[in-house]
């Protein structure tokens, strides 16, 4: 019995996320999860998702209450497999390459979170969320979960903390034990569904699993809970930056969405 209790105590939870300039979301995240999580791992890149060079914005002193738990990962290189422009490519191909490069940068930033797991043991739980996805761990006992993958079904909020978008359930945070973690981009890409065990395609798939536990009431996704200026900055530098520029929408349009 004593050995069992010791094992429970030794199992740690690592909450892992990426960062651009979302101080408000990190503050909310750290406060909600602090009592359940052993380590917060935060990765920031010196490149935006659109490929622009950027300064590092994370200041650990803004989160002094959680300083001892935070592991900060600084990424100063681009992914090696970017697609560079070639003359005479069509506009469509050029746009597709920009989108693909953005995805590669996002995955590169996510996958570098592995640097923050050096003290993690095989039985420790590793959670990944985008920073606006916050799991509710208040009723979760990880020691009783035997599934390989855990997926959190979350409530979606848009623009404001009290603007609940009830028509859509969001499957955001995903978790597994360190021994089962391949990469963080692999964990992120797992389909948010428990597939039947008799499905043959599951055997070959890297994204479809039957050994999955879905956590209902699994937390919150606070999408675009930012100032209009910060929303514009995110859209100009995010995965869909090229599409956003093409729409011709501007700061005033965004401000109208937030304030109406």
Where are these regions (language model features)?
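Conserved catalytic core of nucleotide-sugar-dependent glycosyltransferases
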Residues: 133-244
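Short loop->beta transition adjacent to catalytic acidic/histidine clusters or analogous donor-positioning motifs
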Residues: 13, 34-48, 67-71
């Amino acid at each position: 019995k004593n050995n069992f209790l010791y094992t429970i105590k030794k199992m740690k939870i690592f909450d892992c996320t990426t960062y651009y300039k979302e101080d408000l979301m990190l503050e909310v995240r750290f406060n909600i999860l602090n009592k359940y999580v052993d380590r917060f791992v935060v990765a920031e890149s010196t490149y935006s998702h659109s490929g622009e060079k950027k300064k590092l914005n994370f200041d650990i002193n803004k989160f002094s209450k959680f300083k001892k738990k935070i592991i900060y990962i600084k990424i100063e290189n681009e992914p090696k497999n970017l697609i560079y422009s070639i003359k005479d490519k069509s506009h469509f191909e050029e746009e597709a390459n920009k989108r693909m490069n953005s995805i590669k940068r996002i995955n590169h930033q996510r996958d570098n979170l592995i640097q923050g797991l050096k003290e993690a043991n095989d039985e420790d739980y590793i959670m990944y969320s985008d920073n606006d996805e916050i799991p509710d761990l208040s009723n979760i006992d990880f020691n009783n979960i035997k599934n390989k993958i855990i997926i959190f079904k979350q409530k979606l909020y848009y623009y404001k903390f009290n603007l609940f978008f009830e028509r859509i359930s969001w499957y955001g945070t995903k978790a597994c034990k360190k021994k089962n973690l391949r990469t963080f981009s692999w964990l992120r890409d797992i389909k948010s569904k428990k597939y039947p065990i008799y499905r043959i395609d599951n055997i070959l798939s890297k994204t479809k699993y039957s050994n999955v536990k879905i956590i209902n009431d699994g937390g919150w996704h606070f999408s675009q809970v930012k100032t209009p200026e910060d929303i514009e900055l995110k859209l100009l530098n995010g995965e869909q930056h090229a599409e956003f520029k093409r729409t011709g929408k501007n700061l005033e349009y965004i401000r109208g969405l937030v304030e109406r």
